């Protein structure tokens, strides 16, 4: 039995992860934590999310005493916190010998020079960053098992990279073009006018400047054009990607490339059939659908995930189970 502490448990991702860990027979929850100044401290999780009424746990403030208890009692800590908060907490818990699964972007780039541009802070822990592994579960399982510092990928990168990585050896130098739509839960639980459901209308945002673009490009090893969109639905992501493949590539070559997922139980691949968000919501699955035009060399692949599950909480759980060989 492995004991897991969850910090940032009041948010959508933290609460979803709590439910997933609670359902695992080989995992237990050491505690649920929020910041000391959170208005949710002392409240039951079920007060915030009645759907989790079967989970009788309270949100505790992350005091120094609480941190000491986590170190003494937990095997791992999951951080569902802001990037700048995770930056410090991840380094501290790692230094105490715990396995750290960070859902923020604070450890996703190995290059410290990326952080001021994309996250607005200087990275203060290069020695910890050097140990971090990018937790794209289907691709980096060996590294996830071998390290105690796991950076869980972003939601858009998970959808995009799951679709693109099998094609790496077939791509030309032309940039893949990624158009992705996410539900409003991707913006978090904090009240904001532009993410109020009555205000949301399908629209692009972060055009040619979203921080997930360099994350995707770094992990793919090739630049991409990435345009996210905010959709008027609660949860889920659909990424539709257009790529140019090398001259002479055949449909059989593409099928062979995607056969890498034949033994991946959470990834479903279909040729000439395209996924929809409803089929993956509330699941840990990724559904891929592709079609290739041999005459032009262009391929379109669509990737559907639940942004709170495969794009965050369930992928964190995958990494936990991989790391502890569960």
From Swiss-Prot:
Subcellular location: Cytoplasm
Location, primary (coarse class): cytoplasm
Molecular function terms from GO: N-acetyl-gamma-glutamyl-phosphate reductase activity; NAD binding; NADP+ binding
Key word Transport present: no
GO biological process: L-arginine biosynthetic process
Keywords: Amino-acid biosynthesis, Arginine biosynthesis, Cytoplasm, NADP, Oxidoreductase
Enzyme class per UniProt: oxidoreductase
EC numbers: 1.2.1.38
Reaction(s) catalysed by this chain's protein: N-acetyl-L-glutamate 5-semialdehyde + phosphate + NADP(+) = N-acetyl-L-glutamyl 5-phosphate + NADPH + H(+)
Active site, UniProt feature: 155
SMART domains: Semialdhyde_dh (SM00859)
Assigned GO CC terms: cytoplasm
Keyword NADP: yes
Record pathway: Amino-acid biosynthesis; L-arginine biosynthesis; N(2)-acetyl-L-ornithine from L-glutamate: step 3/4
InterPro entries reported in the protein's UniProt record: AGPR_AS, AGPR_type-1, NAD(P)-bd_dom_sf, NAGSA_dehydrogenase, Semialdehyde_DH_NAD-bd
Similarity field: Belongs to the NAGSA dehydrogenase family. Type 1 subfamily.
Function: Catalyzes the NADPH-dependent reduction of N-acetyl-5-glutamyl phosphate to yield N-acetyl-L-glutamate 5-semialdehyde.
Name of the protein described by the UniProt record: N-acetyl-gamma-glutamyl-phosphate reductase
């Amino acid at each position: 039995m492995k004991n897991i502490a969850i910090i940032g448990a009041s948010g959508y991702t933290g609460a979803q992860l709590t439910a997933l860990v609670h359902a695992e027979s080989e995992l237990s929850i050491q505690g649920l934590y929020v910041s000391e100044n959170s208005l949710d401290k002392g409240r039951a999780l079920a007060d915030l999310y009645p759907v989790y009424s079967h989970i009788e746990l309270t949100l505790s403030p992350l005091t120094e005493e609480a941190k000491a208890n986590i170190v003494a009692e937990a095997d791992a800590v999951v951080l569902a916190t802001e990037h700048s908060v995770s930056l410090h907490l991840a380094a501290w818990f790692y230094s105490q010998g715990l396995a750290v699964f960070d859902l923020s972007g604070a450890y996703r780039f190995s290059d410290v020079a990326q952080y001021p541009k994309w996250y607005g802070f200087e990275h203060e822990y290069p020695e910890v960053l050097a140990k971090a592994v990018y937790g794209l579960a289907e691709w980096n399982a060996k590294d996830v098992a071998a390290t105690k510092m796991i950076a869980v990928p972003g939601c858009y990168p998970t959808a995009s990279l799951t679709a693109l990585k099998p094609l790496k050896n077939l791509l030309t130098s032309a940039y893949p073009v990624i158009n992705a739509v996410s539900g409003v839960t991707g913006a978090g639980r904090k009240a904001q006018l532009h993410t109020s459901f009555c205000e949301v209308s399908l629209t692009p945002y972060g055009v040619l400047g979203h921080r997930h673009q360099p994350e995707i490009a770094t992990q793919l090893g090739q630049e991409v054009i990435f345009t996210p969109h905010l959709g008027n639905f609660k949860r889920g992501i659909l990424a539709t990607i257009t790529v140019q493949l090398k001259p002479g590539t055949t449909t059989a070559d593409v099928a062979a490339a995607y056969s890498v997922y034949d033994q991946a139980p959470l990834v479903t691949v279909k040729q000439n059939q395209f996924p929809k968000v409803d089929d993956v919501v509330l699941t840990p699955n990724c559904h891929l659908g592709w079609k290739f035009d041999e005459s032009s060399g262009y391929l379109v692949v669509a990737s559907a995930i639940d942004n709170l599950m495969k794009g965050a909480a369930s992928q964190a759980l995958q990494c936990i189970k991989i790391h502890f060989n569960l």
